[in-house]
Structure formats: structure tokens, C-alpha cells
Amino acid sequence: MTAAAPLILVVDDFLDNRQMYAEYLAFSGLRVEEAENGHEALEKAFAMLPDLIVMDLSLPGIDGWEATRRLKADARTKRIPVIALTGHALAGHSKGAMDAGCDAFITKPCLPERLLEEVRRTLATFQHEH
């Protein structure tokens, strides 16, 4: 019996982006769940304990920054790696994302291949460390 494929939670309020990333990751053999805002991301993360979260930082309501801080502050989810996705390419945003607890940072627009590469790299790093 083989281990289940890693579960990835893709969080983006823009439906087209979310579906594109989710479909590409699923096509690549990963299990994928989707959330459209920070509140839903927190609910699903606590319920499902995904192996990795792809988090858009610009979300309505609870934004990706705050959702990541809450995930990293909770014992149940603090070890789940978070890849930040943002349309802001400023250097300060990547530092801010890391300060919030993100483990990697990708600027949008982001090709699905680039996201998959970062997901695989981050999963490998965390599986090796934990």
C-alpha cells in the first residue's frame, strides 16, 4: 500500500487563479482542497491539516497575512508550510510574508509549473526537516 499523495490547500479569492492552480496540482498527482478567503482557509486547515498551504496574501476579510499568523500561532497547524502568493513584487512584501510565518514566497502572475516546482521543493524540505 502506498502513502496518500500530499494534501495541498489552495487559497485565492480569484476563482480563475484558484481553479488553475488546483487543477494543475491535482493533475500532477497531489490531492487538492480549495478555499476562497482567509476565514475558509482557517476552517479547512484546522479540519483537514493539509501538508502544505498555498496562500494568496490579498484576501477579503481575514487576509492571507493574518490567516498565516493564526495558523503559525496554533499548535495544530504551526508546522504546516505556507507558500505566499502575491501580486506585489516589492522586496518588503517577501520579508513581511516571512515575518508573518510564510515559508516561501511567489509573485503573481505565476505559471502553474512554477507553483508546482515550489510546492515540491517546500514539501521535500519540510519532510526532510520533520
PLM feature spans:
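Charged docking surfaces used in two-component/phosphorelay signaling
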Residues: 19-27
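Active-site beta3 strand of CheY-like receiver
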Residues: 48-54, 59
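The feature encodes the CheY-like receiver
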Residues: 60, 78, 90, 109
